[in-house]
Amino acid sequence: MNIENDRKGASRRRFIATAGAASLALAAAPLVRGQGRKALKVSVGRQPWAAGNSPVTRYMMDNKTFERYAGDAGYDLTVDYRDYPSAAPQVEAFVSGNLDFGMWGNTPIVRLIAQNQPIQIITVGEGHFRFVLATRKDSPIRNVADLKGKTVGALLGGDPYNVLTQMLRYELGNPDPKAFNITVVNTPTQAQAATIPGGMDAAVLIYPAFLKANAELGTVGIINSFGYTESHYKGPAGEGAGILLPSVKKSAFYPDGYYLHRSFWIGSRKIVESDPAVVTAFVTAQQDAVAKLSKMDPGKVSELAKKYWELAPELGAKVVEDDVLFKRGWCWPTEGDAVALLETSKSMVDGKLITKPLAWAQVKTAFALTAPLDKAAYDKTGGVPDAAGFHDKNAKDLRGAPVWEMQSWGERS
């Protein structure tokens, strides 16, 4: 279902005025509280089996920081946190109007923007997630070329499938699995996919699921989305783990890898326009959690997600250390993060997931309404990082000007 996204000039001016008032409301919290609080219930969808969003939201839940910051803005907030196994059921709830905040990756976000769904991108939810092409420990599949004629599990319509197409594109020259007689089986449940069940020769797994299956079942990795080999690899680049594959340097996403993974927090247009101060409170709570967790031992951070990851601290720490949120220590979207959506849309055309790539204007529009709300949270939490941090040339992730400075973003096609 396509929903028309009508943004008329007058409506935009009214919203900007409202957003500005919301920022002032946060600063003038004692006065607002004295006048009584507005009761509001919001729903927040999270993916606790994934990466950084899991410990971050757990921290927010345990410390009720979303509720507290909303209280500072004059709200008596009740938060309904919901656990989702993947993006698909979240997207369904969101499109049907039954979810206020959700978090999912590049691939479903691009599809929604392409369909003109009225999504508002708020912040980076997690990123630089490691996906592993995995198989059984006794499998003769040792490299990407060995997938020809085989059956591979991947979450259709999600990031794992897109990762697979990019591995095929740069290793074999074509992103379409059908070009190599590869049958792709949908794997909505990562725990099951990680067992490499009968009828499946290999699967693309998220890192927590791979680590658990590797430790308990002996599931082995072939290559990962960062462009490095895993322990079961044997091929033109050599044998064993830790070899940078030459083909990854051809990727538009390098040095991030074959795929520039970013998951974003999404807000419904209704909540963004009717209660912008609540959106700023959400962002403030997220940044508070990210800043605090980034300073903690990664193994202890992973303990917040142990119920879902089921990993010992030394293994959970690997997931935490990969995540761009904890590398940065902040959650603000930048030009580099927006580019991830633009470039992903191009690869999705190659993979026949959408018919044409997004226009740069479409990507920017998806961030536009929430940009002033992010800026309010940035100011409230101490303005970290400074301008130099956004443009750090030595950073190992793609950055750039923050979303509230998108007027300085370059022209792209």
Feature names for model-found ranges:
Residues 58-76, 162-184, 214-218:
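Ligand-binding cleft/hinge of the Venus flytrap
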Residues 41-62, 156-160:
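Extracytoplasmic "Venus flytrap"
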Residues 346-413:
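Conserved C-terminal helix/tail region of periplasmic/extracytoplasmic solute-binding proteins
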Residues 190, 198-308:
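Pocket-lining segment of extracytoplasmic ligand-binding domains
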Residues 50-51, 272-357:
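Secondary-structure end/capping motifs
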